[in-house]
Amino acid sequence: YHNYSEIHRLLTLFPKLMVFYNGPKCGASAPDHCHFQAGTSGLLPLQTGWQRYCRNMTEIFTNNDGESISVINEYPSPALLIRSKSLKGDAELFKFVYKALPMAKDDYEPMMNIVSWRNGDEYLSVVFPRRRHRPACYPDLSAPEAEGSLMISPGALDMAGMIITPREADFKSLTAEKAIEILREVSLNDEEFASVIKKIKENANKPSAASMICPKRREPNVHVGIVSGERIEFSLNGEYSAKDKIITGRQV
């Protein structure tokens, strides 16, 4: 939770960026780590269609500075908007959302994707609450070419409408209807989303809301080695998918 403020800081320094976050089991290739990245703003379908989406929202909570949390009613999957101008307000509003999201017993944070960008002096963060890592159509590694399978594991960009398929065949066969079905499948259902909205209202209206602080969690430092040479050999200790093939063991 405490790292969310980095999104606001980045957008303050680089207002033309779009920043996105993939939580664990929400788009990263390995389910036990997360993505925090940025790219050019204004290219995602979520953003190109924003004039339509922003006209039909239901406000859940507004603070004294006019910063707010809203439901984006017309988006294909459940989505919440945090609209802020200050770093403090942004962090506090996200805290209300974070506290309201369901969290599995063995997880250390709720499943979610976040897409954030600037609109003038406003900071917009869209939070996509998740309940599944991958849709049922995602192929088993033992049968990657199974009929009807689609190698789509939605992350923040996919949830924002830019669905990326590693396989050309999946790209050609994917329809708008199937894409929406996939996004809804990995998102909270209507009942779960209604519960989140209710909890946000309850949390935001508690007298102690302003003092709620999530404990900081120290993130491990990961060092990745980079090697070069005319010939590189390494071994994989499990099965991995690369270029539509299952690979394992010694690689050259």
Model-predicted regions and their roles:
Residues 1-212:
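HIT superfamily nucleotide-processing domains
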Residues 210-252:
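Conserved, single-site charged/polar hotspot
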